Amino acid sequence: MAASNALLLISGALLISLAVLCQGDPVVDSDGDAVQLNLGGRYPLYTIESAAIGFHGGLSTLHKDVCKSYVYEAPETDRGLPVSFSASATSEPVMQLGSRYKFSFLMPVPRICDTAWSVGKSTEETGVYKLAACSCEFCKIACPEVGSFNVNGKTLLGIGGEHFTVRFHKSDALAMKTAPQ
């Protein structure tokens, strides 16, 4: 499949899932703490960064229009956009492996569209996760693995591509209002 056909266009309806090894265990951030969900009120923000060895930036978006953007790996000096997480099917306060969540990239300008993702474990290394794309929130079919593609000097995420794993890092701020549900 050509890289241009495999690029992952992120929209409000796209779900991302992480390959599941230990379904139900909590997802942990780079400090070893469980990743907290937005259940309303104040909630923590995170950045998502490549787990590869070397210098890498965090995940961010390249805007195509109001509700469509490509997810890419920002330059190494950029930790990426802050992200909040919410779940439609659970009231658990922490993210669990194998469950699906909305990941809301916090943009410098208001957006009315969210990106929904899901979580699972990549390796036995604590806090390292692999992404896979799902077409709907409650589908029972397997989700294809997400990898990286180098396009015009930028590392974009897409279906297939090079192996790509991530870590969650706490952001320096707490969100003060509820993210879009």
Swiss-Prot record:
GO molecular function: serine-type endopeptidase inhibitor activity
Keyword rRNA-binding: no
First and last residue of the signal peptide: 1-24
Superkingdom per UniProt: Eukaryota
Lineage: Eukaryota, Viridiplantae, Streptophyta, Embryophyta, Tracheophyta
Disulfide-bonded cysteines: 67-113, 134-143, 136-139
Keywords tagged on the record: Disulfide bond, Protease inhibitor, Secreted, Serine protease inhibitor, Signal
KW tRNA processing (keyword) present: no
Name this polypeptide is given: Proteinase inhibitor B
Feature type site, description Reactive bond: 100-101
